[in-house]
Amino acid sequence: MENMLTFACQQQRRNVRWLSSLSVLMLLAVVLSLCAGDQWIAPGDWFSARGELFVWQIRLPRTLAVLLVGAALALSGAVMQALFENPLAEPGLLGVSNGAGVGLIAAVLLGQGQLPGWALGFCAIAGALIITLILLRFARRHLSTSRLLLAGVALGIICSAMMTWAIYFSTSFDLRQLMYWMMGGFGGVDWQQAWLMIALIPVSLWICCQSQPMNILALGETSARQLGLPLWFWRNLLVVATGWMVGVSVALAGSIGFIGLVIPHILRLCGLSDHRALLPGCALAGAIALLLADVIARLALASAELPIGVVTATMGAPVFIWLLLKSRR
């Protein structure tokens, strides 16, 4: 008994150290994001005339959007991996990201490129929520998590095919631009998208507080039922929350891979297996990873900006493979 208490105390101290370190790293990443750009603006110059324009009007809304989207995607990945008992589960797996893309393409086609940005964002959220509602329809038939996962994969394939057909046969310049936007990027984010940023905050905070049901869900369906967890209720609630976060993230920045898949894995390999530490850790680490990727996307080319989805995949895949090989040793 004493050994168990000692182990629990050591694990708690380890979790606190990890979360404290991630918090400090996130603050440093925010400062770097505000300073970096075509012109380096040190913190001492943030309140100058130049800083008023570049830092507070251009870089700050972009930095906040990157931070919130990174946190939301990493949290979505952690939730899906526990919910579906599948280490490969990630935000795009259920078809929610592709559903948001279909909503955007439908808005561009029906609006003939004349709709404002907020309307496109609303259509992306609507597309994501429609896919979520279809998944809930399947869930009401009390399908197992594996069957629900396969249903999400099938919906994602259908939505991807619809987007490909629409873009391939379109001569609209807006749709060509939309294809580039779906690769992920924060270049067009300003304070007009603040409502999308605000829409991410309450759901992300709520997810961070759901460690108890998440720990039970991670044990598997049979154990969760034996422990008295209302599995159908929590599965539906978490699918809706995940659909909302992914839909808003796609509306804000396009489709971004790697974050939701790899960040929860990396933290588990580092010892953060308890969702009381894993969920806030995912939010912090996801924000850090996407902030660093955004800085690289801005600075890698002198005359253009790389799609952030390309940067996250290029950075993340080798790191993930290295961590897996290290853990096997």
Curated annotation (Swiss-Prot):
Keyword Cell membrane annotated: yes
Xref: InterPro entries: ABC_BtuC-like, ABC_transptr_BtuC, ABC_transptr_permease_BtuC
Pfam families: FecCD
Cellular-component GO terms for this entry: plasma membrane
Superkingdom classification of source: Bacteria
A Gene Ontology biological process term: cobalamin transport
A GO MF label: vitamin transmembrane transporter activity
UniProt subcellular location: Cell inner membrane
Keywords: Cell inner membrane, Cell membrane, Membrane, Transmembrane, Transmembrane helix, Transport
Record's bilayer topology term: Multi-pass membrane protein
Segments crossing the lipid bilayer: 22-42, 64-84, 91-111, 115-135, 149-169, 187-207, 243-263, 277-297, 305-325
Predominant location: membrane
Family (UniProt): Belongs to the binding-protein-dependent transport system permease family. FecCD subfamily.
Function of the molecule: Part of the ABC transporter complex BtuCDF involved in vitamin B12 import. Involved in the translocation of the substrate across the membrane.
Database matches in HAMAP family: BtuC
Protein name: Vitamin B12 import system permease protein BtuC
Native organism: Citrobacter koseri (strain ATCC BAA-895 / CDC 4225-83 / SGSC4696)
